[in-house]
Structure formats: C-alpha cells, structure tokens
From Swiss-Prot:
Residues carrying Phosphoserine: 278-279, 284, 456
InterPro entries recorded: Kinesin-like_fam, Kinesin_motor_dom, Kinesin_motor_dom_sf, P-loop_NTPase
Record keyword Cytoplasm present: yes
Gene Ontology molecular function: ATP binding; ATP hydrolysis activity; microtubule binding; microtubule motor activity
GO cellular component, one term: cell tip
Protein name as annotated: Kinesin-like protein 8
Family: Belongs to the TRAFAC class myosin-kinesin ATPase superfamily. Kinesin family.
Record's keyword terms, sorted: ATP-binding, Coiled coil, Cytoplasm, Cytoskeleton, Microtubule, Motor protein, Nucleotide-binding, Phosphoprotein
Positions of ATP binding: 107-114
Subcellular location, principal: cytoplasm
PANTHER family found in the cross-reference section: CHROMOSOME-ASSOCIATED KINESIN KIF4A-RELATED
Lineage: Eukaryota, Fungi, Dikarya, Ascomycota, Taphrinomycotina
Species, as recorded: Schizosaccharomyces pombe (strain 972 / ATCC 24843) (Fission yeast)
Amino acid sequence: MSTANVRVIVRVRPKSLRELSKSAEDLLSVDSHNKTVTITPPKHGLKHSRHKNRVNGPRTFAFDECFAPSAPESKNLSGQEDVYESTGPLLVKSILEGFNSCFITYGQKGTGKTYSVVGLRGQPGIIPHISESIFEEIDKLKKKSPNTTITVSISLAEIIEETPYDLLQPNVNSSHTPGETVFVQKDSLTGYHLHGLSEFEVGSAQEIDAFLRLAAKNIRTELSDISGVRKGHSVFSLVVQQRIIDPKTRHSLKKASRLQIIDLASFSKGSQRNESISSFESSSNNKSLSVLNRVIAALTSKKNDVLIPYKDSVLTTLLQDALGGNCRTIMLTCVSPCDFDDTFSALRYSEAARRIKNISNINCKEAYSTNNEGELDDILTTLESDREQLRRHEEHSQKLLKFIEEIRNDYEERIHALESQNSALKAHLRLAVDAYLNPLEFNFDDKNVKLKEFGSPNIAYKQELNSFQGELSSLFKDLKLVKSQLHDYPKPEVSDIDMDMESLRHDSLLD
C-alpha cells in the first residue's frame, strides 16, 4: 500500500501564428526550477473577465513540474521527450509492479493535449513512448524470471454525450450505435473501467500503433460543436496480467494492473461564447467536464460532509479510482499563454487536484497450486459471467414486462372501441335490412290515413305506427307535399353494408 497525491504537470504551448500576428500579450511566466506558473492580468484589465472579483494582480500556482513553451532553437525549453521523462517511467514502473495507473490531459482547445498524448511523426507522445518502454521492461522481467508469464491487452473508446463508443469495432462510424454492453464497471483487481469493449492482446509497440491508427479512423469527428471543439473524451486502456510461478512450491501469484490514458474533450474559449459563463463551470457546454470540476472541488474541500458527485457523469464514474481511489494518477494540464480566463481556471483547478490523495495497492490474487489454479480461475470466471448475465436478464425482463403491459392496455382500449363500433354497425344493418324487406306505403287518397304493408308483417313496427296514428292525421298536409320524395328515396343496399363491415375488419388487423 502506498499513499500519494495526484501528480500535476503544467505545459504551456507556444504562441499560435494568429497570436504572433496580433502581437498578443504573454500573460504567463514559468519558473521551471521552483515549479511555479505565474499569471498576470492583461494590460486592458479584467473589466469583462469572469474572474474580476477573484484576481487583483499576478497570481502564482505551484505544481509538480512546469514546462515552458518548446522551441527548436532553445535547449532549455521543453519538448515531447521532457514531458515523457517526467511522467512515463513512473507509469511504466507502477503498472509492472501491479498498481493501477492513470494519465489525464486537461485544458482548452488548441493547447496540445492530444499532441502530448499521441504526438506527430518524429515527435511521439506519451502512448508511443510508454508502448516502447513497457515491452522493453517486460523482456527484462522474462529474462530475469523465466517462470513469469506476462500478457498485455488494450482497448480504445470514446465517451460522447454520456455514451461510450468502442473505437475498435468495425464500421462503428457508419452504424453510430454505441452498443448496449458498454458501461462503467468495477473489477475486483483493476478497478473501474469500460466493460464490454473489444479487447485485443498485443505483443509489441508496433501492434499498439496499428490499433491507434484504426481507432483514429473510427473517431466520430462529426460530433463537434460549432467552433470545432470535439466533445468526446478518448480512453486508452492497457491491462498487464502477470502469472509468477514459484519453482519450488509450484504455487503461483497472479497480478493484474490497468493503465488508463484519458484525453479529455476540449472546452472552447469563454470569450467566444459568453464572457459571464465559465467554460469550465458551465454544464451546458460539456456536462462531464463540469462534473469533473465539481469532483475536484469536493475532494479538496475542507468540509467533511461534502458529497463527491462521481455518479453524475460517465467520465467521473470511470475516474473514481484515479481521483481519490486505488490508483497512481498524473494530470497533464495544457494551457495557452495569452488567454487569461480559461488559463486561470485551468491552473486553479489543477492546483486543487494536486491536493487529492490516492491510496494505491498492488493488485494480486491469492496463490494457488498450479494444478488447481486453472480450474479455480475457470470457475470464478464462469460465476462472474453468470452473475452479470443474470443481472442484465433481470433488467431486460423488467423492461419487457413493462412494455407488454403497455401494449396490453393499449389493445384492450382498441378492442373496446372496436366492439362499440361493431355493435353500432350491427344495429344499423338490422334496421337497413328490415327497411329493405318490409317497405311501407302511405295512401293519401282520402283524409283517413291508411297503412299498407308489403311482404310479411312486422308486429313491432305495427304497434309503433298505431301509436302515432293521431299525429299522422294532423300532419296530412305536410306529408302530401313530400309524397313524391318518399317514392324517390333510395333504398340501402345490403351489399354496400357488407363491404363496409369487411373493410373495418381488415383495418383492425393493421393496428
């Protein structure tokens, strides 16, 4: 067990061509010896700054390492090699010892986060350097301990709008389907990770590079905001499993450790959106970055009853070990030398993150005899898999039962409505058929109204017509005027009614 704070490194990018052309003011001063960065308010003041009530003058922040902008002509300024030397060896050593490790990049758009992680041709970043170093160290361990078996596997993902996407799945860009199986899960040895991703065993740095190229093609670049800022967080996960066999006792010890390199999504400049809203603190721009800042603030708060909002986003759920858990963590904060608001916020949160304490342990299983170890591992793996499948089946069953109940209620309502319509149509049909088979004719030759019936008598109609005999006499004159209309009134066709009923039955099958 070891206790250590999150290690925070700040890297200042050089001025951009646009900043140089505008002679933008340099607001940062880097003291690499004392490991501090001082930010000075711009000459035009802080009238429109969101930090105007927080800053009165130059402010100095202390970190574990500080790198000034790199320049080819100066050997004193940092480059990719310097950044790796201050981070990579510690990560490689930790993961091979069995400790979980995490490397996080943090900062605004265009400050060099992805460049620091991946690099360019001839200027490799953290991942290519670590890939080379880790296999070199594995070769040394195998030569030193021939009875040690070591495997390395990797996975790559991108978290976009609270949804993890597998970057090593074929055709991921065309389907745009995240897959229901990818979610954050805690493993008994390697801690919180994205479960359900494609995981591939690799044997060299070249193989890792090939998978990185595949992932780069699958990154969903269309999901970015209007300023071109990519909303996704890239997650590179490397798992090292070691099986160390004691040649005397034939007992073995299994170690498992996970290195996660997380390139956080960029946040756009506050001045390009709304100067009164912080690009760090506004959840409307990127919910997960906002939650991350709240987690950092809660972990470093002096209050004891503060709730840590890990569960408020997928990103912070994944980072539970990295921030305050079983992990050795390094944060690389990349900042701009000319932007006051976002640079000040980045430095402020990064200095706070440096106070977060992690307690890390070597991840190992109890030793078993090699004769039984494989069988026990298989049983444990099967049980874990069965438990997970049972949990997912229960969730699916609940959703299915709810869906079936909704469908049942909907169809009961439809059946009731159709039965009502059917009863009305039957009544209509009976009246129409009866009127067709038993037509009535009134003889108005004299003043006494007489009823003539054709066909077989209908007793019900007789009784009803007799009750209205007096009224019919008083309406003699009116009925005489419409006599001709009664003779011309069309008789309902039974075939037409049958057709309407059949049409209604077919319509109900489509529901």
